[in-house]
Amino acid sequence: VNDKNLEVRLRTLTPLWTGGVEAGKVDRIHETGILGSLRWWYEAIVRGLGGQACDPTTPACIYDPDKPNNGLCDVCQVFGATGWRRRFRLEVIQDEASLAWTPPPNTLNIRPPGRVGQITLRLTGDDQALALLTALLRFLERHGAIGAKPQLGYGVFRIIEIKGASQKPWVWPSLGLDQSYPALPDLRRFGFFNYRFTADWGWWSRIPALERLLGRSETARALQQLVQQGMIPVAPLLKNAWRFGHWHGPRRVELYLFGTSRDPRVRSKLNVSWAYPAKDGNSWEVRGWVWLPEQDHQGQPIAPHFLQQVWQNVRDVSIWQTALGINDGTLTCSPDVSTWQAWTTDGVRNFLKEDQ
């Protein structure tokens, strides 16, 4: 077939975690960890554009040439399903990443270390698949993350170069069915935020929680290693402020929105990066996203005023300033609304277009 190659060189802005042979250790960058996150985001985008995406935990798609679209949802057509091969290959062809810090174990409430540095991905596929993946990576560079553990602030990256980019830019289609997925990730119910501020290089050392880490030799060393790479682990500070300082609501809803590592584990719907130097080189940036679902995993509705409370707190500059010990800063939110409301499919499409 007329398969082509695309090479994407990227640099980690926060540690990248893709799992490893041994639980809790990442010995190299694993393609499967990147693929899983690309699929998760593509599912959310497809649902947000009104298309069909099966639930990956109970996949319904099996290739059947007698059915419309061969019996495959919009996502499985690209990412593969039983009897249907993925439309592209992904390989890590250069891995210059190293451990984010050298643990003694159990340091920094943000373990495990993950990897930092530059990596090059090679994507092989048809023109259309490569154009789609380029658009998806460009979107994630600005708003999302790759790999696992985004709830710890991991996986934020910057694209340095794309070689062999498709001549035809990808156009996000309106998938038009307007189906509703109240309990599955759907970009219509995502809010994105970006906080940018200027501060002297040592601003982070005055935050009490990080100051405490500096007071112990083993955590101080890990923290210094991160700082040298321009990564300040502020995610736990912000999440603690939003959850323990400003959340008022029932425990059931709190656990579902903010997550829990106890059994059964629930992944946080609110994800925020670490602080890293912005592209302009003169300021710092912290960004993230929140998914505000209509229902929890058991099909119980979540009252809109609880979702509004989370959105309002994310948009509250004073919470950011207090948590980070900063006096200035600009907070940008999408959608730019003070009262939370879901996007329309057209709104999602226009938002995606901005990144191209």
Where are these regions (language model features)?
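Basic, Gly/Ser/Thr-rich N-terminal segments that form RNA-phosphate-binding interfaces in CRISPR RAMP
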Residues: 1-356
